[in-house]
Every structure is written in structure tokens, then in C-alpha cells.
């Protein structure tokens, strides 16, 4: 039972002598559970997970799992997405207060009104949204497939894109589209400073600047590579550059 609503999880002491990893593994077997962890999680959580990935990869794993219980170590909208894909399975989010500032920047009631103000538009939403926003959406995309989905529509198609204005601006720039953008953003990616990136580039002139498209356009424009979390990881492994200046979350590179 959740006794402290402010922290979103049961704050109980671990019994003395209990091996936490062994206990997690025992319960996982007994309950036929699968643990999915986002790249943003800390290393100890990633180590215990059955699968680690970005939003798209974890959604795909959730959709094909044979487990009865999905333990989703991610933010609230990710658990919702897993439940939508697997309505007959029990989906658990370890911390009920694990929120996403980007999803929070797009209240469903306000977004529905925004859609009404733009009749005749196809509504494309980034996966980082609540289930209520997805309910008024025609197509849900990830940063991995957003460009492909947008380009699948005829060029004269009127499109609303939400909630991330930075990702929307990036897609507009590389596709030549003029999508109508909802004015939302991730507070983490908003904090990256162009001035700081340029300062670090002077210190490490041989470093590659690699960026997630949720960053502001000035940072994207000076980047050597822009991509989803999975794409950034793959690029880092294959890159000939030894040093990378990364404008993204920290957990993905533990």
C-alpha cells in the first residue's frame, strides 16, 4: 500500500540480509514478469532489466512479450503506452510520480481545443504524450520514425505536430514541411546552451557534437549528428571520433 503519496512509491526499509537482486529475480520468475527499463535509468536499474531501450524499442518489447506482468521502469506515459498495446496484461510503474515535463506541457483538454482550431489537419503526436492526448491523435511517432511518418503524407497535407516544438521544428527543417506546432518542450533538453556547446567545442576541437532533436534549433544546427537515443548510441559506437559532446540525457550513456 502506498502510504506516502508525495514520493509515488512504497518507502520501506530493505530487510537486513536480503539480497535485493536475488529477490527481484525470484519474484520475476514466480510472477512471470518482465522488466523494461528506459536508457535514462541509472546503471543498477538497467543491469536488472530484461530489456533496455528507447521509447520505440520498449513499446515493441511490450507488444510481443509473453509475460503476465510488465514492470516498466520509465515515466508514466511509457507505462500507459504499454497498457494500450497490452490491455490484457498488468503494467506496473515502480514510481507513480515519475513524470515527463514534455508530456506535462500538453494537457489533453487544451490540445483537443488546439486541434479544433485547425480543422482539416492530420494530427501527429510524439510518443511522449499522455494516453488522453493520443486519443485525439491520428498517428503516434517516435524520434526514430517521425521523419518517415511525416514524409509518408502528401506534401500538401496539413499537419498538426505536438507536443515538442523543437522536434517539430527539426522535422519541418529536414522535410520542408510547414506543420503547425504545439508549443511544448522537455525541460532537460531546453536547458542545453549553445554558448556552452561552443565553449566546449573550443576546448575539444576534435569532438563530435551529437544531439537529440528535442534540443533547440541553434544547438541542432551546430551538431555533427542528430538522432534518437538509439541512433545516438549506435553513432557513438561506430564514430571514428574518440570524444563526443552530447546534448542529451545522461543515463543513456552509462
Predicted regions and their residues:
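Short, well-ordered alpha-helical microsegments
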Residues: 45, 59, 78-81, 111, ...
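Histidine/cysteine-enriched polar flanking segments
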Residues: 72, 239-240, 252
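Carbohydrate-active enzymes and regulators
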Residues: 89
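Conserved beta-alpha
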Residues: 93-106, 124-127, 138-198
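Catalytic alpha/beta core domains of metabolic enzymes, predominantly
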Residues: 193-194, 198, 208-236, 246
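Conserved small/polar residues in nucleotide/adenosyl-binding loops
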Residues: 243-250
Amino acid at each position: 500500500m502506498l502510504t506516502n503519496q508525495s514520493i509515488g512509491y512504497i518507502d520501506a526499509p530493505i530487510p537486513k540480509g536480503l539480497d535485493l537482486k536475488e529477490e527481484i529475480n525470484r519474484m520475476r520468475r514466480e510472477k512471470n514478469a518482465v522488466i523494461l527499463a528506459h536508457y535514462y535509468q541509472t546503471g543498477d536499474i538497467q543491469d536488472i532489466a530484461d530489456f533496455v531501450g528507447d521509447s520505440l524499442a520498449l513499446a515493441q518489447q511490450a507488444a510481443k512479450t509473453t509475460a503476465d506482468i510488465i514492470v516498466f521502469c520509465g515515466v508514466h506515459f511509457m507505462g500507459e503506452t504499454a497498457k494500450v498495446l497490452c490491455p490484457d496484461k498488468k503494467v506496473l510503474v515502480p514510481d507513480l510520480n515519475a513524470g515527463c515535463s514534455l508530456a506535462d506541457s500538453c494537457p489533453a483538454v487544451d490540445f483537443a481545443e488546439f486541434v479544433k482550431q485547425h480543422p482539416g489537419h492530420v494530427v501527429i503526436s510524439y510518443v511522449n504524450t499522455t494516453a488522453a492526448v493520443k486519443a485525439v491523435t491520428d498517428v503516434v511517432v517516435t524520434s526514430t520514425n517521425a521523419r518517415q511518418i511525416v514524409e509518408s503524407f502528401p506534401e500538401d497535407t496539413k499537419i498538426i505536430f505536438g507536443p515538442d516544438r523543437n522536434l517539430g521544428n527539426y522535422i519541418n527543417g529536414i522535410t520542408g514541411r510547414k506543420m503547425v506546432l504545439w508549443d511544448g518542450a522537455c525541460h532537460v533538453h531546453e536547458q542545453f546552451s549553445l554558448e556552452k556547446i561552443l565553449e566546449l567545442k573550443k576546448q575539444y576541437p576534435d569532438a563530435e557534437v551529437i544531439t537529440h532533436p528535442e534540443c533547440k534549433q541553434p544547438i541542432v544546427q551546430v551538431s555533427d549528428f542528430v538522432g534518437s537515443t538509439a541512433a545516438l548510441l549506435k553513432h557513438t559506437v561506430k564514430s571514428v571520433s574518440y570524444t563526443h559532446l552530447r546534448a542529451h540525457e545522461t543515463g543513456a550513456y552509462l
